[in-house]
């Protein structure tokens, strides 16, 4: 059960934070179909930043001394860098959609096509191969919280809660959960959030009250890009073996499905992310999931084809959207370019 919960969180957290990214953009009135592309770019930037930092004196000293606080600081700094570059990358969509009033679906699709090509081009220049590794050696262990991080021997039993939520888990998981809560409160309990949502529902009415619709939409897409970029790095660190290869396994599109399934509401999105994370976990680790807890009968022993397990997350996506999309209520003005002269 510990393994299942930890792996579910590993898959659910990037989905949750990127789905919230989609909410911020669409609540402002812009369809951010480019979440996949921004994730790919954020993953690349995060991996490249750690790769560049691994040779610095501070990181080398922290590794040799076992200074886990400094390494966790590097993890947080990399999350911020990936978020910043994701925000910059999203400005391409903002400019095309807000200033040029281009079709937002086409603009997002263009970024989704450009991002993997650009990332692979840069990886070839940097590493002369198709995959960019974060660092030499087991870089995942740098950022993972373990018993040794807290000065406890690995033979000590922490019980179910400690073994599940404090051992062999990433600090980024809890940072993203905290960020998700804070941003959800900002979106629904602050003046900024009210203005942002007004621009996605009735921009003409918002404009008549003195709200700068263009500025609010830029803010929504920029926050969306920052979250998607951060989600891309978290995916690369926790799921993609600390590497970037111009692909995030469709997590950006899955996040869009989670957003729609969650009806653009943070609490629903959190639940949907855990559901999709569970099925991604089953698809990726079915051969290791112990059904009875005795280490004998594994999920793989049922006799179901491995291909079906790998299809599960995407089959569930289709089924969920088929049965819930009719009840979903998107912001009324999403996807519609705002013209100040129309009423």
Locations of regions flagged by a protein language model:
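Loop-to-helix entry region at the N-terminal start of transmembrane alpha-helices
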Residues: 3-11, 156-182, 309-314
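Cytosolic-side transmembrane-helix boundaries in multi-pass membrane proteins
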Residues: 183, 201-208, 213-215, 287-343
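Alpha-helical transmembrane segments within multi-pass membrane transporters and channels
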Residues: 60-116
